Amino acid sequence: MFINQEIAIEQLSNKYQLLPRLFELGKEIVEQADTELNKEHLAKLLGFLLLYKQCSPSVIAGLMWNTIPDEQGLSEFLMKATVEDFIDFNGNKFITKFLVSEEEQKKLDMYCYPLPLLMEPKEVKNNKQDGYYLKVDSGIILKNNRTNDDVNLDYINKENKIKLELNQYAVLNNHNEWSCDMANQMNKQMFDRFNLAQQEILTCYKDRPFYLTWKYDKRGRSYSQGYHINIQSNDYGKSLINFNHKEIIEN
């Protein structure tokens, strides 16, 4: 039974990974459009603006650098996209003309990052695997720091096998609050959306043991993986998690 539930959750996470899904939505917008602009490039631009809503020219240049590295080419592309009414420009920032539907946004908020596993992760046998059951294989090295060099897989597998559960007292009595210190990571509106999604996820995992996967950074430090539920979260997030197996520790 758990394997079917696990696969269903992973399918949702794979479908609603944030940027890939927004690029897909951008592609749907431009698919039938009558334009001479490169539709693949246009879909990517619209995807970024669906995420950020508005961006300065310098930010757009950074986001699109791998796609259109030529400054003059990008400038002409943005001008044409504005003239053809795919985006707006207010003199300072490029602004999206499209919004994600409320239903789609809710799914993105909930499934934009792989959720904790309901069953013990698959054994990681090489650097390209990640412990999940569907073959995504994001690897155990964070970001783009892929390597074929030997890393300690035994440690990753040991951490992955630790069974966890929610601290129901903390779920019911503790509260996550936005502060100005969070402004660099998310604004109040984004925080409120995150909070709503997190509460739904916590309800889904109530009374259900779960597992977190782990990855290394390029320096060899290990990090638990998770967005709504993560050991290495803020104080509120940390308070939500208990070991499933408990022992009384005596002097």
Question: Where would I find each of the regions flagged by the language model?
Answer:
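Non-catalytic nucleic-acid-binding interfaces of large nucleic-acid enzymes and RNP effectors
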Residues: 1-251
